[in-house]
A protein has these predicted regions:
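Extracellular beta-rich ligand/substrate-recognition surface
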Residues: 93-94
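Short Pro-Gly-centered beta-turn/loop motif in secreted/extracellular proteins
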Residues: 103-109
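Beta-strand signatures of extracellular beta-sandwich domains
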Residues: 124-126
């Protein structure tokens, strides 16, 4: 699928003739994220599975304006979102901390997570060898260890960052 432009539409009461690739200059166009990661191939190269989140976004600066800074080779996990009131993270999130405890109530059977990182890095969530997607339910019990791994898009570089969360009931 190749989206070059959207034509003849209305936005906030204004008729737009054409909005697309190069409409906002030579560095503008469409970019695609798969689970909050700017993909490194065309959209047709990826198999979408249940739970995937795909977003077509418009950039006017080769992606830097929407989180795809090609010059930033960091895989650093910079934030952690625990959806809802699932529990208390200890210590509080800090870029330099690599190991956390999430204390949950006994009635919590699953949690949903989303880590923040450079969108040129792919963030993956594991319990053992089972991978979960951002915001998908991750089953938890006392002692469950969730590994969050961020890998810079160029996997040959070996640039990664890993955090672990141990569940305490």
């Amino acid at each position: 699928f190749y989206l070059s432009a959207i034509e003849n539409f209305t936005h906030n009461g204004e008729v737009i003739d054409k909005f697309g690739e190069f409409s906002a200059g030579y560095m503008s166009g469409w970019m695609i994220t798969l689970n909050d990661w700017f993909i490194n191939m065309g959209a047709s190269e990826f198999l979408v599975t249940e739970g995937d989140t795909i977003s077509w976004q418009y950039t006017s600066n080769l992606g830097e304006d929407i989180g795809a800074d090609w010059m930033n080779t960091s895989a650093k996990i910079t934030g952690l979102n625990i959806v809802g009131n699932a529990g208390q993270l200890s210590p509080a999130f800090d870029n330099e901390v690599k190991s956390y405890t999430l204390t949950v109530q006994k009635n919590i059977e699953a949690i949903q997570l989303k880590a923040e990182a450079n969108k040129m890095s792919r963030v993956q969530y594991y319990v053992g060898s089972v991978e979960y997607k951002p915001f998908n339910n991750i089953p938890v019990n006392n002692g469950t260890v969730i590994t969050i791994k961020s890998t810079y898009e160029d996997t040959m570089s070996g640039i990664t960052d890993t955090d672990e969360i141990t569940i305490k009931v």
